[in-house]
Design a protein with these regions (language model features):
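Metal-cofactor-dependent catalytic cores
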Residues: 1-149
Length: 149
């Protein structure tokens, strides 16, 4: 899935495809920066351009904790399948000819825990996903393949 929240605190909306801008983020997302400069605490920061999480992590969390959260509830932009995202820290990868760089792990935070209303720490530490930098402009769609470079 592909998810975007238009403003801080707003619910995320699912999309079939999104436009990405190098150094700026996902068009329409709360962290998108028109200028590429830091207009707030996060906009324009390479590790806030796009976030990813593994569907397998969400499924495992739901199963182990007895929950049925939807993948969008985790507030990551992309939900992937079949690839270990932790292995992409410090590495380049592509999705539909768009180049990305894995900046750091996207650890779960207290605000996500409050939003979900259940304990997610320490269960999701080291499993919360990946923060990545968008290296070139392009469009990605649901079902596009993530390929490590």
């Amino acid at each position: 899935g592909i998810y975007v929240a238009p403003a801080k605190g707003a619910g995320v909306m699912g999309h079939q495809k999104v436009s990405l801008r190098a150094g700026k983020g996902i068009e329409g997302d709360r962290y998108f920066s028109q200028t590429g400069k830091n207009r707030s605490n996060y906009q324009g920061q390479p590790d806030w351009e796009i976030t990813l999480i593994e569907s397998e992590v969400i499924e495992s969390f739901n199963q182990q904790q007895g929950h049925s959260f939807h993948e969008s509830d985790f507030r990551r932009n992309l939900v992937t399948q079949g690839i270990g995202l932790n292995d992409l820290v410090g590495k380049c990868f592509t999705i539909n000819n768009v180049s990305f760089y894995g900046v750091q792990l996207c650890e779960p935070c207290a605000s996500l825990q409050r939003r979900l209303g259940v304990r997610i720490l320490p269960e999701l530490v080291g499993k919360g996903g990946l923060r990545a930098q968008i290296r070139c402009n392009g469009v990605i769609a649901v079902g596009d393949k993530l390929t490590p470079v």
